[in-house]
């Protein structure tokens, strides 16, 4: 058991090192995409499943409340939090549409969809991205593995942050770190002189 614990930490550290080498440009582009959308009076819609849903909620909460700095609230909506909406859509046998319907209802040109999917193949996330494209939204995608179907849907204005790993737990850990990094970059860019 002790050896397994060490392996978990070692794998996580190795993934962080690989990501630190591979992802700064993509994370910077994503942060600036989010900042420009907010500065233009737009909002960020976020979605994911399971742990990715938790990461989406964490991002939205950090925008609406605060991350590490006291500042005005920023408009972000986690699409996975309204159980009535989710179950109403799913009850009509539209499981794949639980996020896409919300994107079509709430998304506008200039908004950003933050789509989080470990493998990039979750049907409801893929459909949400397709809906965002029809609404002229920009997509920031957090993925892993080979990026899955999601990676193939992204255009030149979109940003994929693909964690360099084929291990779901490590990808999800890095998604949380990436979300925290994005929140910090947004705060530092929009409110550079705010005190903690």
From Swiss-Prot:
Residues of the SIS domain: 34-196
InterPro entries associated with the record: DiaA (IPR023070), GmhA/DiaA (IPR035461), SIS_dom (IPR001347), SIS_dom_sf (IPR046348), SIS_GmhA/DiaA_subfam (IPR050099)
Q: Which domain of life is it from?
A: Bacteria
Which CDD domains does the UniProt entry name for this protein? Answer: SIS_GmhA (cd05006)
Query: NADP: is it a keyword of this entry?
Result: no
> Which example biological process does GO assign this protein?
DNA replication
* One MF term in the entry's GO annotations: carbohydrate derivative binding
Keywords of the record, alphabetical order, are:
DNA replication
In the UniProt record, does the keyword Transcription occur? no
Task: Give any Pfam family that matches.
Answer: SIS_2
Query: Function, please?
Result: Required for the timely initiation of chromosomal replication via direct interactions with the DnaA initiator protein.
Q: Which NCBIfam families match?
A: PRK10886.1
The record's similarity note reads:
Belongs to the SIS family. DiaA subfamily.
Binding partners and assembly: Homotetramer; dimer of dimers.
Q: Return the protein name.
A: DnaA initiator-associating protein DiaA
* The species this protein was found in: Salmonella typhi
- Organism phylogeny: Bacteria, Pseudomonadati, Pseudomonadota, Gammaproteobacteria, Enterobacterales
**What is this protein's gene name?**
diaA
């Amino acid at each position: 058991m002790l050896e397994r614990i060490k392996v978990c930490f070692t794998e996580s550290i190795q993934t962080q090192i690989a990501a630190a080498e591979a992802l700064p440009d993509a994370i910077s582009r994503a942060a600036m995409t989010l900042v420009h959308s907010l500065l233009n009076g737009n909002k960020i819609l976020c979605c994911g499943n399971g742990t990715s849903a938790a990461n989406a909620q964490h991002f939205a909460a950090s925008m609406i409340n605060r991350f590490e700095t006291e500042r005005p609230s920023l408009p972000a909506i986690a699409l996975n939090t309204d159980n009535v909406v989710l179950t109403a859509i799913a009850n009509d046998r539209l499981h794949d549409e639980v996020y896409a319907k919300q994107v079509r209802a709430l998304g506008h040109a200039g908004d950003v969809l933050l789509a989080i999917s470990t493998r990039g193949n979750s049907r409801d996330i893929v459909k949400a991205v397709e809906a965002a494209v029809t609404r002229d939204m920009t997509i920031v995608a957090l993925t892993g593995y080979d990026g899955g179907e999601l990676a193939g849907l992204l255009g030149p204005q979109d940003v994929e942050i693909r964690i360099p790993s084929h291990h779901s737990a490590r990808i999800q850990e890095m998604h949380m770190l990436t979300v925290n990094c994005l929140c910090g970059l947004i705060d530092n860019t929009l409110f550079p002189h705010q005190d903690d």
